[in-house]
Swiss-Prot record:
Name of protein: Phosphate acetyltransferase
Subunit annotation: Homohexamer.
Source organism of this protein record: Buchnera aphidicola subsp. Schizaphis graminum (strain Sg)
SUPFAM superfamilies (alphabetical): HprK N-terminal domain-like (SSF75138), Isocitrate/Isopropylmalate dehydrogenase-like (SSF53659)
Chief location category: cytoplasm
Gene behind the chain: pta
Length: 709
């Protein structure tokens, strides 16, 4: 199984791109033992560097570049579409890649960066590494940063926090409140003493930290350079000659407007020289002498609309000396104004520089911490899923089943829309029960594109063939043929008989019919699975960060201890069917041995029965809801609990408490609840709420398809 690691910046300036590429570089090194064999890289903001990354890391790294959250409003339709796309990509890539690295969004790139990063990490169940900077290596600075991160973790409840990388330590740029322009930065670099690269730090600084420090990377003056190619791409300038500029760097900028004798005394190595096109011929002789005796970094002609023939001849003398020459239509003042906004960027054209940068950065990684990323043990079952991940998993699992699901309420537009979606996505083969002409008219009136390949069964044409079977099944009730024909006018009963015959694999109803009208025919015709003594139900409660299972909230009014135990076992089996590791809480108004009375004893007995029948299941009860879902509360109330505040299946003592709770949670928090899903029948029949949305119906059809064996 693969791992998804997401790098999340906690500040605007943390060298996120460099660290992302350095992690890829670390695992891509041939001599690196225990490295990942194949991995994917997914930046959330599209970058111009993607093609270079592909070329640099060869075919071993699969770079995903069709996702871009830049300027996408949080929770907009575009945002939701991209989030679904990420979930799909991660789900598919996990099958072929051992390691998926996601580069998060910085606050500089998006105002909602913190919320977007959190939302994506939770929905794809990513393990998270925070990237931050440090003013210096002092203990005080580290502790202040530690407190800040601790507050951030309390605000954003990340499930899988792996550790932290500190970058740009001692950088002169990041902690001054001034906003430096490009020229300021060049001056600071010029005046900054050569910094000493610190390869070892007093480790006692990090011993008592509540988080793991994966790397602490000092700022390095030598690696902060402005490449000529990046500057001229930024200015959208035109290159006069064909000289290669991918290795050229600029440390200074000057304007040729002084006396020739003064100009000749200065050094112009690694300097960008700006000359107004109107003064080029005046300075040509001086320029030629400078180029002949000294190295000029590059020349930029400003205010050029079109080069004259004479100018081109003059420039050839300069280019023959190996000096890159560019021109731009903006004048000198406009060009300088633009350059103020330029920032230091990685020169992806210079592979030697990239190698040095990545080698330097990766040398500070705690190799044991990084290699340990490969040691995660996983299995098919997970403790829980995020809502988006769970819904996507429903679609994928149902697609693999290729099941036929009958829908008896085919005159309801929501049902037709859901059937159309299921057909288009391949979730299930939906069978509509009704008059074809009437169904197509309803679809057209509601602008529903109902594919002609969706099968429609006309009940008038098939009812008679199910009369004998209904008489046989209900012979104990001594019904006659007239009564049987009357019952078969109910499409739910007819659909249930079609299911019983094996011509379809499941049934979904309830948008028009009551729960009783959906379930009663199933109990009478399909009947209970021989391994169970009852039929129960569960709801999937889609919380913002996880999916919980509530049972029984729809069928059994006052279950006894044996029935509660069976409901718990059925719910655990259903959870496993969907890849969820069951951890069951048998709910009560008291926890452990704090309460007495027949209601508590019923829960205690039910828990004992489950433990006896299924010792493989994690279960605790009697337990209160807060102790079942909160680790902090569990440590106080029931520290010996086998689930310790991490339950994902909640079994309610009766229908009254279960139904009230699920509806209160759903409505108060505006959540999606999928269900009720029936358990214990020989074949899957599922009920819909009469207020079910099209999305609810689609997911219920998917659930039913997955239940079909």
């Amino acid at each position: 199984m693969s791992r998804i690691i997401m790098l999340i910046p906690l500040n605007k300036k943390v060298s996120l791109t460099t660290i992302s590429l350095s992690i890829l570089y670390f695992f891509n090194k041939k001599e690196q033992k225990n490295c990942f064999k194949s991995f994917s890289y997914l930046p959330l903001i599209k970058s111009d560097n993607i093609n270079f990354i592909r070329a640099y890391f060869s075919k071993k790294i699969n770079v995903l570049d069709d996702i871009n959250f830049f300027k996408k409003n949080f929770n907009s339709d575009e945002y939701s579409y991209l989030l679904d796309k990420i979930i799909k990509e991660c789900f598919n890539k996990k099958k072929i890649n051992e390691f998926i690295l996601i580069k998060g969004i910085s606050r500089k790139e998006h105002d909602d960066a913190d919320q977007i990063n959190f939302d994506i990490a939770q929905n794809i169940d990513a393990e998270v590494i925070f990237i931050d900077n440090l003013k210096d290596f002092s203990l005080g600075c580290f502790k202040r940063k530690e407190r800040k991160i601790n507050v951030f973790l309390q605000q954003k409840k990340y499930k899988n926090f792996l550790g932290l990388i500190f970058s740009d330590i001692n950088s002169p740029f990041i902690f001054n409140k001034m906003k430096y322009n490009f020229f300021d930065k060049l001056i600071i670099l010029k005046n900054t003493k050569k910094n000493t690269c610190i390869h070892a730090i007093k480790k006692n600084i990090f011993f008592n930290s509540f988080f793991r420090v994966i790397a602490f990377i000092p700022w390095n003056k030598k690696l902060v350079k402005s490449s000529v190619i990046n500057i001229f791409k930024f200015l959208n300038a035109t290159l006069v000659n064909t000289i290669s500029i991918k290795d050229a760097f600029i440390k200074n900028i000057t304007i040729f407007d002084e006396d020739s004798s003064v100009i000749l005394k200065k050094s112009y190595a690694n300097t960008l020289v700006l000359i107004s096109s109107s003064r080029m011929e005046t300075f040509f002789k001086t320029l030629y002498l400078v180029c002949k005796s000294k190295k000029i970094g590059a020349i930029l002609l400003t205010g050029v609309l079109k080069l004259s023939e004479n100018s081109i001849k003059l420039l050839k003398f300069l280019t023959n000396q190996g000096v890159p020459v560019f021109f731009i239509k903006e004048n000198t003042v406009e060009t300088l104004s633009q350059l103020q906004k330029f920032n230091f960027n990685i020169n992806v054209q210079n592979k030697y520089f990239i190698n040095k940068l990545l080698e330097y950065t990766s040398s500070f990684f705690n190799k044991n911490h990084l290699i340990s990323l490969k040691k995660k043990t996983t299995n098919f079952y997970k403790k829980t899923y995020s809502p988006k991940e769970f819904c996507y998993r429903l679609k994928i699992l149902s697609k693999s089943k290729h099941k036929r699901i009958i829908l008896p309420e085919s005159y309801e537009p929501r049902i037709l829309k859901a059937a159309s979606i299921c057909h288009r996505l391949g979730i299930a083969e939906c069978i509509l029960l009704g008059d074809p002409k009437k169904i197509y008219n309803i679809a057209n009136e509601n602008k529903i594109d109902l594919n002609k390949n969706i099968e429609i069964k006309d009940p008038i044409l098939i009812r008679d063939q199910y009369v004998p079977r209904l008489l046989e099944i209900r012979k104990n009730k001594k019904i006659d043929e007239i009564f049987a024909r009357k019952q078969l006018k109910d499409n739910v009963i007819l659909a249930t008989l079609i299911l019983e015959s094996g011509k379809v694999d499941g049934l979904v109803s309830g948008t028009i019919n009551t729960t009783a009208n959906t379930i009663r025919p199933a109990l009478q015709i399909i009947k209970t699975d021989p391994i169970y003594s009852l039929v129960s139900s569960i709801f999937f409660i889609l919380l913002p960060n996880e999916v919980l299972i509530y049972g029984d909230c729809a069928i059994n009014i006052e279950p006894n201890s044996k029935e509660l135990a069976e409901i718990a076992i059925q719910s655990a089996n259903s959870a496993k069917m969907f890849g969820i590791e069951p951890r069951i809480a048998m709910l009560s108004y008291s926890t452990g041995f704090s309460g007495t009375g027949w209601q508590v004893e019923k829960i205690r007995d039910a828990t004992s029965i489950v433990k006896s029948k299924r010792p493989d299941l994690l279960i605790d009860g009697p337990i209160q809801y807060d102790a079942a879902i909160s680790k902090e509360v569990a440590k106080l109330k029931i520290p010996y609990s086998s689930i310790l505040g991490s339950a994902n299946i909640f079994i309610f003592p009766d229908l009254n408490s279960g139904n009230i709770t699920y509806k209160a949670v759903q409505r108060s928090a505006d959540l999606i609840c999928i269900g009720p899903m029936l358990q214990g029948l020989k074949k899957p029949v599922n009920d819909l709420s009469r207020g079910a949305s099209v999305e609810d119906i689609v997911y219920t059809i998917a659930l039913t398809s997955i239940q079909s064996l």
